[in-house]
């Protein structure tokens, strides 16, 4: 939505870590890059490229080659859950932020599983001093009640004009009170 809103509709690919976990919707399972997650679901959702977790050490050596003209964002779990409890090193998060700034793409740090105090910090990314553009959160805000939110900076929010994003259950009063 952000790149579309600024006249760059072809900038729509997201680079993710293979075997990550970003949810169970059709697009989210393809973001995972995991055959286990996508087997039996189709057609394949385009728009995702992947790097292996090992390429996060020490400074994502292969990631530069994966960023193309149509890359819109890099999305990583700050602490990988499904692929084993593997925190992304602070230096790697810092490198990703610098790389995203240089390439003029967004940094999405998925904190659905590890955010809201579950890592010892309010957000796991805070220890790295990195400021992401987008932060999906969920499990920690509802204490077991189904609720989620997507936090974003002003620049990204400027692309979220009325009618560009919606949810069947969005804004549920009980969920909002619990969260």
What positions do the PLM features span?
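Conserved N-terminal phosphate-binding loop of PLP-dependent enzymes in the Aspartate aminotransferase
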Residues: 1-179
């Amino acid at each position: 939505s952000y790149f579309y809103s600024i006249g760059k509709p072809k900038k729509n690919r997201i680079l993710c870590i293979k075997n990550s976990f970003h949810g169970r919707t059709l697009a989210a399972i393809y973001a995972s890059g995991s055959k286990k997650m996508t087997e039996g679901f189709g057609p394949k959702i385009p728009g995702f490229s992947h790097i292996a977790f090992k390429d996060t050490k020490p400074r994502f050596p292969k990631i530069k080659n994966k960023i193309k003209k149509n890359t819109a964002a890099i999305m990583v779990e700050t602490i990988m859950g499904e692929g084993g409890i593997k925190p992304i090193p602070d230096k790697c998060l810092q490198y990703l932020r610098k790389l995203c700034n240089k390439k003029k793409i967004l940094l999405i740090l998925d904190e659905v599983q590890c955010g809201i105090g579950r890592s010892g910090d309010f957000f796991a990314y805070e220890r790295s001093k990195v400021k992401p553009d987008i932060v999906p959160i969920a499990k920690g805000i509802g204490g077991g009640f189904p609720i989620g939110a997507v936090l974003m900076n002003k620049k990204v929010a400027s692309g979220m004009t009325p009618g560009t994003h919606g949810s069947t259950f969005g804004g549920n009063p009980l969920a909002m009170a619990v969260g």
